[in-house]
């Protein structure tokens, strides 16, 4: 029973739409009505400005990061392979990612999983996240597309998990990569058409 409570709590924390909340509280804006219509960090930068964008990014990363430690904090007794699986920090963190992408508070229309996924990876393997961050910003510096940088970093996470032979991370990162690519499908189309906005601060 405690495992179910832990997973539900992870989902509900992940589902907190930080971009939407900050937009409403401090800017009187529904971020879904501007830019890409997304509630995540990238659209927060675009619609609410850099300070708010950084805050949303931090909060989205933090909500993924903190859920990884739920199995340590909750008095959960894993007495079989199934319960052991669902008390793994990555799996608990995955529920936060799913909450971010499909938040119950906003009729299951949320962000694109990038920052919250980064928080989960930070919690389980900070060195891998550092490598992925270097790749992300390297691609961003060259091409100026946040969406492309996110997709490439996600794919590199899948490859990296195979290299370090972390197969639970592999399964999670593969699933998240698929979700991330699907969520960025309109961005991909715009990139091929030359219509995707480029960042100007790098």
Swiss-Prot record:
Catalyzed reactions: an acyl phosphate + sn-glycerol 3-phosphate = a 1-acyl-sn-glycero-3-phosphate + phosphate
EC number: 2.3.1.275
UniProt-listed SMART domains: G3P_acyltransf
Statement: the UniProt record of this protein carries the keyword Transmembrane helix: yes
Superkingdom in the source lineage: Bacteria
Pathway: Lipid metabolism; phospholipid metabolism
Enzyme class per UniProt: transferase
InterPro entries with a match to the protein in the record: G3P_acylTferase_PlsY
Name of protein: Glycerol-3-phosphate acyltransferase
Quaternary assembly: Probably interacts with PlsX.
Keywords, sorted A to Z: Cell membrane, Lipid biosynthesis, Lipid metabolism, Membrane, Phospholipid biosynthesis, Phospholipid metabolism, Transferase, Transmembrane, Transmembrane helix
Predominant place of localization: membrane
Function as written in the Swiss-Prot or TrEMBL entry: Catalyzes the transfer of an acyl group from acyl-phosphate (acyl-PO(4)) to glycerol-3-phosphate (G3P) to form lysophosphatidic acid (LPA). This enzyme utilizes acyl-phosphate as fatty acyl donor, but not acyl-CoA or acyl-ACP.
Membrane topology: Multi-pass membrane protein
One term under GO cellular component: plasma membrane
Stated family: Belongs to the PlsY family.
UniProt-annotated location(s): Cell membrane
GO molecular function: acyl-phosphate glycerol-3-phosphate acyltransferase activity
GO biological process: phospholipid biosynthetic process
Coiled-coil residues: none
Pfam family, one: G3P_acyltransf
Transmembrane segments: 2-22, 54-74, 85-105, 120-140, 141-161, 162-182
Species per Swiss-Prot/TrEMBL record: Staphylococcus haemolyticus (strain JCSC1435)
């Amino acid at each position: 029973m405690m495992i179910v409570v832990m997973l539900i709590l992870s989902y509900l924390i992940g589902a907190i739409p930080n971009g939407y909340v900050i937009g409403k509280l401090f800017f009187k804006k529904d971020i879904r009505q501007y830019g890409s219509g997304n509630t995540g960090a990238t659209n927060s930068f675009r619609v609410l400005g850099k300070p708010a964008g950084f805050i949303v990014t931090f909060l989205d990363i933090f909500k993924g990061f903190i859920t990884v430690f739920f199995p340590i904090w909750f008095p959960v007794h894993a007495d079989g392979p199934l319960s052991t699986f669902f008390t793994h920090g990555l799996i608990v963190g995955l529920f936060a990612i799913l909450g971010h992408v499909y938040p119950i508070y906003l009729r299951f229309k949320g962000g694109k999983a990038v920052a919250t996924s980064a928080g989960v990876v930070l919690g389980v393997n900070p060195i891998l996240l550092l490598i992925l961050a270097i790749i992300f910003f390297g691609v961003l510096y060259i091409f100026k597309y946040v969406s492309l940088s996110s997709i490439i970093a996600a794919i590199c996470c899948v490859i990296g998990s195979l290299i370090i032979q972390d197969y639970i991370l592999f399964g999670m990162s593969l699933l998240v990569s698929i979700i991330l690519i699907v969520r960025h499908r309109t961005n991909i189309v715009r990139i091929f058409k030359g219509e995707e906005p480029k960042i100007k601060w790098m």
